[in-house]
């Protein structure tokens, strides 16, 4: 994780020849090279030279630190330098340069990044040189599905506000971003959504090397108005538009640049938001665009220029997130429904029918705005939304941990944990500080269980194309959001092991259904089992198995939980977390097994494996069982 080291900051003013390259745009999805040049004079020709492919196969240590970066550099064979004669009057050129059949496409499983160097020559001398990194990839959508190079993808993402407590600013070096993304990949993520900001080039480059889909966002959280409205701010909106163009020009070649959002939770003119989106889309159509993240929350619309929709609901009661704050009520299924493994959002996204009560009646409503409340106008007669573009759920999760006060000592940089100190003082005033570790552990177990319910519901939804967590790690800005399974330094808090988290957040997740987690001994249940699967290789000779396991409670276990330990933690585990017998599988014993053969897995997406019939074991007293589903195949 980026550390607070003193580094020299270099600021340069670079003079260039008047025959200079203004920018390079590589349209690699269709294997074309487009070069945009600053207007110049008196040059004869320039040469594009494809130099190398970068392949990123890397192993991460326990916390992703101190390792070498084992990139394998490959040079494409039989691709000579190519000379193009150019008129001095040409300022925009489109040149074709085929890479040949040996060139590989870029995606999360084969993140192959190419480097292009372009030089302007005159009389054998180099007047100007530019280098660009790119990948062969094309993002598209069809109805409710997202595709990369015609292969369906599902976004397993997280919000990121670029908060770095030790420095107060985002790192600009590649290695720091490789650690950030590499750690998140270990937790099954393949997507980052940046909240009202655009990360630096090093972030896009690291994401390209590691196969992360990045969504940048205009730096705005507010209302957009049309010209003529009394609230219209021409300078503000022109600034946002130019910032978007600059981001696209600077980073658009990098293959990780997946999406572009117009801002966070915008209100105001939908027509003007759509216009701004259209201008950016016309400027650079290599990415997918969305009007914003959770715009017009209670009265959303899918706009004509939307390539995908990011939000939390399509009307007051058509919710596709598991939990909500009271200011955004009604609450979600995690908060209101019986615990079980049965929920999905398909009917909420594409309902069989619409009732008249769902449309808006207009007027003024209160919304959350930053850390405060604001009133906004709602238009009358808003039509019910049936999306025709992919849907991504916005800022899901937000399950709080009680603070871990031992974390305070980690804040050795510019950001001071005054909020954590205040929380500690409050607990001490109430005589509860001695129980702080217990509160931390208990709240963590509850948060992990809630995240499991929420993510499995998202993966169980055929009509959903991705989710964006808030957050995989704590967010120490804009108040306090201790909602991550990792703290603000990307260190696991210990509530759930990385391997257990990946059981419900990865590119291959088993999704058995259970109507309830509370059953009677002897009951017969049927579980339909589905599989979210995106790995490039299929599965053959697939066998599904379900096992009932009785968890025996060890004597004195609760007392054992109270004792703190100073032992070294396991990899990625918070040092203050004491694992007890009840937290492990040590007391499990097999009591019943049910298995069945399944069809080979040859595709991607949400697949149905079949149904397993099970009988709940008889028991004299209340007992805690684990029902463990597993999938085996010849090539898993």
Where are these regions (language model features)?
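Secreted/periplasmic carbohydrate-active enzymes, especially glycoside hydrolases
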Residues: 1-194, 206-207, 258, 282, ...
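Substrate-binding/catalytic cleft of secreted carbohydrate-active enzymes
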Residues: 191-487
